[in-house]
Amino acid sequence: MNDTRNEIIRIGNELVRSVGYNAFSYADIAKALNIKNAAIHYYFPSKSDLGVEIIERNIKAFNELTNHWKSLNYKEQY
């Protein structure tokens, strides 16, 4: 996957966690990465597209961390 795209997602994720989804803009990401807003729009035409990607990656990471729990017995899970 493209490094710029991954960096946009990484910074977006950091901003969601630190200031919240509604409190950051593409300009904040562009400034952090020293790129133009248009570069972000190339990968994510709307902020909601970026938000969905961030959520999907977090869900995937959570599932990867917790998948092994299914093989544990009830007491080991807790």
Model-derived regions: residue spans:
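Short, basic, alpha-helical segments at the C-terminal edge of helix-turn-helix-like DNA-binding modules
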Residues: E56-N63
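N-terminal intrinsically disordered/low-complexity leader segments
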Residues: M1-D3
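Helix-turn-helix
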Residues: E7, I11, L15-D49, E53
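Hydrophobic alpha-helical connector segments
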Residues: E53, N67-Y78
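Positions in alpha-helical segments
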Residues: K36-A38, E64-N67
